[in-house]
């Protein structure tokens, strides 16, 4: 009996400290920290990483719900969760909500996590913007509690953030779930992205490899419920949002023909002659060997503002670079021949070519 108890004790001790092995992890985030290099908040662990001289710093996050909003501003840092569905980082922020400084967050700052460094990896966790979009969506315009600007970002890959790797991560939101900013490069593998209105958007280069892109219904009836992408890719940038061997699916209550594959976003910028829709934004989205479910009806137009503050429309056929190739499923090739990528262009469409290297393997 004594030998058995000793073995059990050793086994328990082994399982207790296995995840905190310094050879594997540099810091541990847990709801119950009780030792050196253990923290209750992810932001505390990131500060430890910033103070460290270690180049590749790994933060392991135990299962739990972490109500935090933060920037990842340390190069070569990894945030690794214990499990994708039970390690949850969440925050309630929408564009029209008031921040602690008494101002509206705005879309770009409504994020839960924003990557502002190079060579950052997120792995095995969920990033959720917990703003109650469905409840807000059904409120009338004269309801004083209604948030008029309901964009709520879960993850933002910031301007100039290079070589971000997002692996086995769920991004949970509704409108504007994922923002990939200009001059950023990111690789998503075996990820799930949920949303409805323009829920993958921005001017960065991003590859979605074997991902599940899930459309969510609106809580009030409408013919068009949303759009998968809204790229603002610079005209001199060859690629924008590229989906490879992925599934573009839906939740059970999403009707057929209710979602656009994407629409061209021309964000307003300030120029020498005024502020208006960026003429150099020619959004790029490609679906390569993807499954397209029946909720998709093709590409759509999007509006912007001209120099005289008049609304103008950008056409998916002429003001964007929207293509698919080798699609399967009910909505395959529904957008027409002009949006089928050529065989020559398809041969060049490797992950290495799009991302400019093999760094995503490391």
Roles of regions detected by a PLM:
Residues 21-362:
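Sequence-level preference for short, compositionally simple segments enriched
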Residues 1-19:
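Gram-negative bacterial Sec-dependent N-terminal signal peptides
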